[in-house]
Every structure is written in structure tokens, then in C-alpha cells.
Regions:
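C-terminal segments of enzyme domains that contribute to small-molecule binding surfaces
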Residues: 162-230
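C-terminal end-of-chain micro-motif
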Residues: 93, 230-231
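Tandem repeat scaffolds
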Residues: 2-190
């Protein structure tokens, strides 16, 4: 079944009712766009806190300066959205797709973004402070000035430079842990690279992951053993 398609006029009316509901739930109605086709709609500056966009198709929507705090975007398609200065604080957006989105100076503080995708998105100066980014994908994303302080970045995929972004000490230790585990746990890298990685083992073994998986392991050709630092 195809997603319900809304006209801009219908969207405007639903947003107006939702904004009234935020002020007094007796007179308005909460917006429910779950599963809707909202491609290219204009929601700039609207207050849509706690609205439901679960599994909605919002490709190419205009969301600049809108407030989506505590909204539900689980499984939603937000590719190519224009959402600079938008607020997604404390929203649920697990498995959502923000590929190639323009999110400069957007806010995702405290948001749940597990397995969300930000491939080729512009996320410079975005705040992911205290967000859950477990297994999120930032491959080829444009970062810089991005705030990841106290965010859960376990198994996050990066392949571009992270210079200028904000990571706290615990997160740096986690990044070191996953790097050391990947390099030393296999035989695909050169001895030079393996020896270089050993120099940050003490940092890696301070990661929270050690409590769950143990210290960094290395493969010695026969079995995995606890990795040793370069003497």
C-alpha cells in the first residue's frame, strides 16, 4: 500500500492543530504523519514537538528552524532534507535515513539515532551531545565543529577526518579500542601499522568496552590472546 500523500494545505492545517495541541490538548490534535508521503513539504519554523513521523517519506522536505524535539522519526526517510538550525532534541530516530541532508547547526541532543544513516550529509556544527549513535553511519559525511560529547558512538562508521569535532576522553578511548581491536585482531595489516597501533593500547584498554568484551585481543596466528604494548 502506498503512503498517504498530503497536500501542502493539509500539512499546514495539521501543523496548526498540533501547535494548538501543544498549548492546550483540549482544543488541538497531535500530528500523526506516520507512514505519510511528505516529500518536498515545507515545515520551516513549525513547532512539531512530540509529532509522529514514524516511517514517513520526507525526502527533500524543507525543515529549517523547525522544532521536532521528542518527535518520532523511527525508520523515516529524510534524505536531502534542508534542516539547518532545526531541533531534533530527544527525538526517536532509530534506523532513520538522513543521507545527503543539509543539517548545519541542527540539534540532536539526547536523541536516539541507533543505526541511523548520515551518509554524505552536511553535519558541520551539529550537536549530538548525549545522543545514542550506536552503529550510526557517517560515511562521507561533512563534519567539522560537530559535538559528540557524551554521545554513545560505539561502532559508529566514520571515514572522513574528525578534526575540529568534539569528543570527550571516554569517547577517544572507545575509538582507540575499536581501532586496536580491528588491527590487532586480524592479520591483514602490516607489521609497521600493528606496532604503531600498540602504542595506544593503554588508552584503548581504558574504554568502557573492556568491561563487556575484555582487553584488546590480538591474533598470534593460532589464537586470540591479550595484546601487548610495544616495549
Amino acid at each position: 500500500m502506498e503512503n498517504k500523500v498530503y497536500t501542502q494545505e493539509e500539512v499546514n492545517e495539521i501543523c496548526t492543530q498540533h501547535e494548538a495541541w501543544l498549548k492546550d490538548w483540549h482544543i488541538g490534535k497531535r500530528a500523526d504523519f506516520s507512514g505519510a508521503n511528505l516529500r518536498g513539504v515545507h515545515l520551516e519554523g513549525r513547532s512539531l514537538r512530540e509529532a509522529n513521523f514514524q516511517s514517513a517519506d520526507m525526502k527533500g522536505a524543507f525543515l529549517k528552524s523547525a522544532d521536532f524535539s521528542h518527535a518520532n522519526f523511527e525508520g523515516a526517510n529524510l534524505t536531502f532534507v534542508r534542516a539547518s538550525y532545526a531541533k531534533f532534541n530527544d527525538c526517536i530516530a532509530d534506523h532513520a535515513c538522513f543521507d545527503k541532508a543539509h543539517l548545519t547547526v541542527a540539534y540532536f541532543e539526547g536523541a536516539s539515532l541507533q543505526r541511523a544513516s548520515f551518509r554524505e550529509a552536511q553535519v558541520n556544527f551539529v550537536s549530538f551531545r548525549e545522543a545514542n549513535l550506536w552503529r550510526a553511519d557517517f560515511i562521507d559525511a561533512v563534519t567539522g565543529g560537530t559535538n559528540f560529547v557524551r554521545a554513545d558512538i560505539d561502532y559508529v562508521a566514520f571515514n572522513t577526518g574528525n578534526a575540529g569535532n568534539c569528543f570527550d576522553d571516554k569517547q577517544v578511548a572507545e575509538l582507540a579500542y575499536h581501532l586496536c581491536s580491528a588491527v590487532l585482531g586480524s592479520r591483514t595489516n602490516s607489521p609497521e601499522v600493528r606496532d604503531t597501533v600498540r602504542k595506544i593500547l593503554s588508552l584503548a584498554n581504558r574504554a568502557e568496552s573492556v568491561k563487556v568484551f575484555g582487553k584488546v585481543q590480538e591474533f598470534n596466528g593460532v589464537k586470540h590472546v591479550t595484546a601487548k604494548e610495544t616495549e
